[in-house]
């Protein structure tokens, strides 16, 4: 595949790849997913063609619930349909998602995962919203950075069509959705060559049509409801192999290795972290630091979360693993553990010489997760009795769940240039830095990364732009802590920060 690189964020990557497979887009805006729908709407208005040589039909509804209802109806009518959402918006879609999954319709929900309103509202990122959907019956595919959003977004659409199961393709709100990187984009002709047109034809033949009447959405009595519900098992049993097949095709086309569960680290690792989402990038960076010192550490990065294939997961974990930490970016009060932790525990249940497994929470509401915190996890795993149900990045002086805070360690490596720009919301600092990164990324061989931290106010609030440039791909999915350059555009900040 001819390589074409562009500077874009995760939302743009999701919009770009989803547009290729979409005939109808049902949209309603919600932070931080809104740019995905905005780009699709803009491209459709300009007449951009998908892989079927059609312009996407965009339908903006009155709410997320309406968008999900539109998606259900559109899929039932035989149109490949996509939507984009997050947080409370995803929760409003759940009643319709049950129908889409129950009827085995190949829709795709691209979700920039965001915190839910609990004790307080938060517009920032974690996995609280997508974890509320894990029992519905959709497949769930996780991406860790903008490049993975581009690549695995394609896998989500391709596998949904061939497997006849809807997908939730999710990535971390703000940390991935708004992080700008220089990434490789797809040629739509390559994507077209991958799609199973026989599966597309089968889907379209099942569309509601007065010439071929069928009964759907009816009431079933106890004599058949249970048995018909179990009939869907075959689709979910086949899905991991379908996803694996498309991941292999994407890997061959791009040169990047994608598996249901990607292992990274020492071959004989004794201490292993299981995680998904953007934190896996920071963990990889930390592993490089530790293995250079001879430490036996590793990571299993989860991509296909549902269906959770125990066979593929156990094959990815080194046989030498003594202690495992499972990191969840959500909190489930009252449960014996968080979702991913319980899935991992279940996989090892009854196995001989099973490793010790502990769980921890991190990153709720976009709380920053740094290499120092990852180092604390590995140090905890090396203890004779590692702490279970721990937290990272906070000081819990009430229930004492937090691991000890460690001093930050610079992980960027040689050739990395880091900069911080302090500004005021709507003063132009963020916009100028976005343009600077795109100019440098588009006109040099440098890899680039830009992330912008700010509060919930539209304008007049604190902003800080975190920019990195380097000769190698940048995996630092956390705020800049050791900048080479600092600019302060608000004089009052000199006395505040």
Task: State where each predicted segment sits.
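A short, small-residue-rich loop immediately preceding and capping a beta-strand
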Residues: 24-27, 56-59, 74-92, 106-111, ...
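A structural-propensity feature for long, helix-poor, extended segments
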Residues: 62-64, 119-138, 310-332, 452-490
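Conformationally flexible catalytic loops at phosphate/diphosphate-handling active centers
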Residues: 52-56, 167-262
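Peripheral docking tails and interdomain loops at the edges
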Residues: 323-412
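Anionic-ligand anchoring segments at beta-strand to alpha-helix junctions in alpha/beta enzyme folds, i.e.
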Residues: 24-60, 267, 272-303, 415-482, ...
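Terminal amphipathic helices with adjacent charged low-complexity linkers/tails
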Residues: 172-213, 315-353, 358
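Conserved thiamine diphosphate
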Residues: 123-173, 197, 346, 350-365
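Glycine-/acidic-rich phosphate or pyrophosphate-binding loops and their flanking alpha/beta elements
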Residues: 7-13, 248-271, 402-416
